[in-house]
Amino acid sequence: LLGELVTKHGTTVWLVNTGWSGGPAGVSDRMPIAYTRAMIAAALDGGLASVPTTPDPVFGVFVPERCPGVPSEILQPRSAWKDPEAYDEQARRLAEMFRQNFEPIAGLVPAEVREAGPRVG
């Protein structure tokens, strides 16, 4: 239903990280509220509409390459981590957890939803 409404009304959907950035909990910092506000403002005022995006190789979401008021490295999670290989491992773990959690209902959703999930491997 959500997908139908998004398509019907031509809505753009943005996912905003308001949690940890730069590493796992306990090692990194929370996303600064000023950056969160800047991302939301840019999404609402159309400031992200023409910005180039890069697809995340694991999660498949398209990440803006820049956003007014936000350092570019913050937008790319792997670049924000001090240890990019540790990010890769955590991303793989999270993708696998998602896959396992989704498995019981996978047959109940359309193929396009199943195919939009994280790429585990």
Report the location of each language-model feature:
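Conserved NTP phosphate-binding and transfer environment spanning the P-loop NTPase/kinase superfamily
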Residues: L1-G121
